[in-house]
């Protein structure tokens, strides 16, 4: 069962301290009776609806700021994964080059086992050495899915700067004027411009949240693909290093036998 009685409004939790209990929900029945009671109830309901709309708009704006912040963290993590991929690929190329050099050394060792035949073969058919590849000549690229996700999210960086709670205040850029609760005494609910503005703000924030969550999903899926591909590189690298270690030990034994 709920921890709060039925008279409490759960939406009050958003704007208050975590340790505080939510304010009780009030409606027209809580107002005193009297000659002006119907007008007071109507006035109160208008103000209450407007206050709730304002709180909801503020809540969605905070959620939007957190979404952009999460997206920025996701982009930074994705870029770090891309750099890690470059390190792994360069390491794999270095191991391949070491293996190639070791094979050439083994051929030389086998050739000089016979003094005459080894010298003849060595000068007659010297193995063609492949020039070593320069590290960093080609920039490593992440998988296409992650690359597209990073590019799409970086286009939203300006929105992140505009919505970050440490860089702006909600009332600095909101089109809804502050203190609107006192301006509804003569406005009918369907025609209240302040309420309409809050609704537009809420709808806009929810639309941006929906699109932003889609981008976050793309980043997550791209990172998953990138991690899986890097796992494959690590598996190949581990196998090559183990094989290289065996060949090095074998070459050492052959050198000692000369």
Curated annotation (Swiss-Prot):
Q: Name one GO cellular component term.
A: autophagosome membrane
InterPro entries the UniProt entry points to: T_SNARE_dom
Q: What is its main location?
A: cytoplasm
Q: Which residues carry this modification: Phosphoserine?
A: 77-78, 114, 163, 182, 185, 204, 210
Report biased composition (Basic and acidic residues) as residue ranges.
18-32
Q: Which residues form a coiled coil?
A: 76-107
What is the membrane topology here? Peripheral membrane protein
Which UniProt keyword terms apply here? Answer: Autophagy, Cell membrane, Cell projection, Cilium, Cilium biogenesis/degradation, Coiled coil, Cytoplasm, Cytoplasmic vesicle, Golgi apparatus, Membrane, Phosphoprotein, Protein transport, Transport
| Listed GO biological process terms | autophagosome maturation; autophagosome membrane docking; cilium assembly; protein transport; synaptic vesicle fusion to presynaptic active zone membrane; synaptic vesicle priming
Domain t-SNARE coiled-coil homology as annotated: residue spans? 196-258
- Provide the GO MF annotations for this entry: SNAP receptor activity; syntaxin binding
**Function of the protein:** SNAREs, soluble N-ethylmaleimide-sensitive factor-attachment protein receptors, are essential proteins for fusion of cellular membranes. SNAREs localized on opposing membranes assemble to form a trans-SNARE complex, an extended, parallel four alpha-helical bundle that drives membrane fusion. SNAP29 is a SNARE involved in autophagy through the direct control of autophagosome membrane fusion with the lysososome membrane. Also plays a role in ciliogenesis by regulating membrane fusions.
Q: Which family does it belong to?
A: Belongs to the SNAP-25 family.
What protein does this entry describe?
Answer: Synaptosomal-associated protein 29
Q: Which organism is it from?
A: Pongo abelii
List the gene name: SNAP29
